[in-house]
Design a protein with these regions (language model features):
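P-loop NTP-binding site
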Residues: 181-289
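Signal for well-folded cores of large energy- and translation-related assemblies
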Residues: 24, 28, 43, 47, ...
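Conserved C-terminal guanine-recognition region of P-loop GTPase G domains, centered on the G4
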Residues: 45-52, 71-142, 213-218
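Residue-level signature of catalytic and energy-coupling elements of molecular machines
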Residues: 9, 19, 42, 57, ...
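Conserved G1/Walker A P-loop phosphate-binding module
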Residues: 1-80, 224-227
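Conserved glycine(s) of the Walker
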Residues: 15, 152, 243
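Canonical P-loop GTPase G-domain recognition
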Residues: 109-110, 119-183
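Catalytic P-loop NTPase motifs of RecA-like helicase/translocase cores
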Residues: 38, 62-63, 96, 121-122, ...
Length: 289
């Protein structure tokens, strides 16, 4: 029996969360085409051949001078030092410089390079990409991957197990995440915000879950969407409340599908100026310890 923690790191939009969801077989981690959608570390529990893999989904590695983004970057870097193995995920279209930047972090544990989205590239171009890695002074263990083929899933999980220690399970095998119900619901609402709003507005929003009531095979959820200005509040609500309705419909569908319960979602938009610089608020929403 093996069990261990595996940090999943890489630049923003490398496909980390999509990869984790495909390995798990559920859409648990927040997925968006926008950068820095993942804000919080999430442990995802995967059972494979009587072994337990705890994948740690982290914020994307990127360069930024903004204090809030620095907070996300530090969370990702910290996870690198608190695991048994690192999966460095990069798109097959990324330059090898992305991997070199990762090496500059001087990881203390072994790592695998997961070359993601290989289904989108021609075979000869994939070979050319692999040859770039072979030219490095120390050639890493590279695992090609696509979420659209189960063969790649099994191959990656088999490879991960080789690096994990003999250890009892850290979590009940029935668990899929260590997050509580409120945390999972929060992520699904944030995902809907990213899907339904454009430009910079999603980055100005955070979600607080006030109450979750489970009764008679249904969920009733009271949640606040917190933004930083009255102007952004108006945009979130939209004309005739169409935008907030759309956010609610998408989030409610995802929550209902995940928990297999009829869901009633009540959203209220509130303003808290510069919430991203408020230490107490960041602790309250789980972005800072």
């Amino acid at each position: 029996m093996k069990s261990g923690f595996v940090s999943v790191v890489g630049r923003t939009n490398a496909g980390k969360s999509t990869m984790i969801n495909s390995l798990l077989g559920e859409n648990l981690c927040l997925v968006s085409h926008k950068e820095n959608a993942t804000r919080r570390k999430m442990n995802v529990v995967i059972m494979h051949k009587e072994n337990q893999i705890v994948l740690v989904d982290t914020p994307g590695l990127h360069e930024s001078n903004k204090s809030f983004n620095q907070l996300l970057i530090e969370a990702a870097k910290k996870s690198i030092d608190e695991c048994d193995l690192i999966l460095f995920v990069m798109s097959v279209f990324d330059k090898i410089d992305e991997y070199k930047k990762f090496l500059e972090l001087k990881p203390k544990v072994e790592h695998l390079v997961v070359l993601n989205k290989v289904d989108l590239i021609e075979p000869e171009k994939l070979l050319a990409k692999l040859s770039e890695f072979n030219a490095l002074e120390k050639v890493p263990n590279i695992i090609p991957y696509t979420s659209k083929n189960k063969f790649y899933k099994t191959k990656l999980l088999d490879e991960i197990i080789k690096y994990l220690p003999e250890h009892p399970y850290f979590f009940d095998p029935e668990y899929t995440t260590d997050k509580n119900t409120k945390d999972v619901i929060k992520e699904l609402i944030i995902e809907s915000i990213y899907q339904n709003l454009s430009d910079e507005l999603p980055y100005c929003c955070e979600v607080l879950i006030s109450k979750v009531i489970e009764k008679d095979n249904s969920l009733t959820i009271y949640a606040d969407i917190v933004t930083d200005s009255e102007n952004h509040k108006a945009m979130l609500i939209g004309r005739d409340a169409n935008t907030i309705k759309r956010i609610g419909i998408v989030a409610r569908k995802r929550i209902s599908e995940l928990f297999l319960l009829k869901t009633n979602l009540k959203l209220i938009v509130k303003v808290q100026k510069k919430w991203y610089d408020n230490e107490n608020f960041l602790k309250k929403v789980g972005l800072k310890q």
